[in-house]
Amino acid sequence: ETILDIIFRGDQPSAAVPGGSVFNGIVSLGRMGINVGFISETGNDRVGNIILQFMRENHIPTDHVNVFPDGKSPVSLAFLNEQSDAEYIFYKDYPKQRLDVLFPKLEEDDIVMVGSYYALNPVLREKILELLDQAREKKAIIYYDPNFRSSHKNEAMKLAPTIIENLEYADIVRGSLEDFLYMYNMQDIDKIYKDKIKFYCPRFICTAGAEKVALRTNLV
């Protein structure tokens, strides 16, 4: 998913940029000249046009972005603290018909990145599973980033079976300590890996803001 982030420092808006966990990763790869594709949706409106233009400027094809005629493109307000950590408020008005788009052709060792609530949303689950099944069939590498926000922490138990299913599909799981605080109320990296990740996926990358990145595998 991509969304237009309106960034606030203090109480004043300072910028408006397309964002999203998976989207930000794709943007970085596109800027490096790596061949990428992005599956998403946006509205036929000014916000949607900003997102599509940003993609083109960063060498990301828009072939697999569904532009829906009804509803509105999603927007978030991101309030940054002194450490530049963001607290989000989301505004979304999607149509009933979702993600009506053809998936790109996958090949062995392609990397498929999925994440955020987009990969958990019951409305989109059938399409997400279709993509994950194609990736598994073609022997692509599945990279899962939960990017679990505080706005969904009260749904964590209800979403747990879907999270587990995503972990089972994943070849690599990358999450932040903040994600696992909201998902499991856990902050110990070793305990998160041993109790929540390892059984489903042996490869785990955990970030902690400005602190060191941690790697856990069945060999490390």
Locations of the language-model features?
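Alpha-helix C-terminal capping segments
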Residues: 24-35, 80
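Short pre-catalytic strand/loop immediately N-terminal to key active-site residues, enriched for Gly-Thr
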Residues: 10-19, 220
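Conserved N-terminal subdomain of the carbohydrate kinase-like
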Residues: 6, 35-116
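Conserved phosphate/ATP/ADP-binding segment of small-molecule kinases
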Residues: 138, 152-220
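Active-site beta-loop-alpha junctions enriched in small/polar residues
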Residues: 93, 117, 147-151, 178, ...
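Positively charged, low-complexity intrinsically disordered leader regions
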Residues: 1-10
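Short beta-strand/loop segments at the ligand-binding rim of alpha/beta enzyme cores
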Residues: 139-146
